[in-house]
C-alpha cells in the first residue's frame, strides 16, 4: 500500500511542528515546563485570572492540574471555588511578577511579530487557521 501526502500538507505539518518546538524552546529558556508555560500564558492572556476550564481546554487535565499544584505550592497562583463546582485561578502578586518575567515575554514576542503584519495578513492567517481547525474537527467526527 502506497501512502501519499500532499506536499503542501507536509510543509504545513512541518511548520506546525516547528512552531510547537519554538514554544517548547521558549519555555525551556525561561526555566519552565510546557504545562507551566500554558498555565501562566493563559492567565496572562486573561489579565491574571481565569476559569480553570480556560486553561484545560486543549490540554490534558492531569497535566494542567500537576502544573497548577506546583505553582500553587510556590505561591504563584491560587484557586477559588466559583459558581458551584467550577474553579477560578488567580495569579498572586508574586505570580504576576513571575509571569511578567516569563510567559508575558512570549506574548510580547507574539505582539512584536503581529505588529509587523498588515491587518489583512493577520485576518487571512487567523481566518484560514480557524477554518482549517473547524474542517479538521468535522472530518475527525467521521472517523
Where are these regions (language model features)?
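C-terminal regulatory/oligomerization modules of transcriptional regulators
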Residues: 1-2, 120-143
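N-terminal leader segment of winged-helix/HTH proteins
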Residues: 1-30, 76
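Pre-recognition alpha-helix immediately N-terminal to the DNA-recognition helix
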Residues: 11, 18, 22, 38-42, ...
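N-terminal helix-turn-helix DNA-binding core of bacterial DNA-binding proteins
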Residues: 21-63
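DNA-binding alpha-helical recognition surfaces that contact promoter or target DNA
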Residues: 41, 66, 127
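Residues within the helices of the helix-turn-helix
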Residues: 51-53, 69, 87
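Residues within the DNA-recognition helix of helix-turn-helix
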Residues: 63, 67-70
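Charged, amphipathic alpha-helical coiled-coil/dimerization segments
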Residues: 72-127
Amino acid at each position: 500500500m502506497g501512502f501519499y501526502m500532499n506536499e503542501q500538507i507536509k510543509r504545513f505539518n512541518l511548520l506546525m511542528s516547528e512552531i510547537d518546538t519554538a514554544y517548547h524552546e521558549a519555555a525551556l529558556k525561561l526555566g519552565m515546563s510546557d504545562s507551566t508555560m500554558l498555565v501562566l500564558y493563559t492567565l496572562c492572556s486573561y489579565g491574571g485570572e481565569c476559569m480553570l476550564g480556560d486553561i484545560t481546554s486543549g490540554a490534558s487535565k492531569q497535566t494542567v492540574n500537576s502544573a497548577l499544584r506546583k505553582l500553587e505550592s510556590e505561591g504563584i497562583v491560587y484557586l477559588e471555588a466559583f459558581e458551584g463546582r467550577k474553579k477560578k485561578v488567580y495569579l498572586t502578586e508574586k505570580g504576576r511578577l513571575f509571569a511578567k518575567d516569563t510567559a508575558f515575554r512570549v506574548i510580547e514576542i507574539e505582539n512584536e511579530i503581529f505588529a509587523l503584519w498588515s491587518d489583512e495578513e493577520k485576518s487571512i492567517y487567523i481566518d484560514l487557521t480557524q477554518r482549517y481547525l473547524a474542517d479538521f474537527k468535522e472530518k475527525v467526527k467521521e472517523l
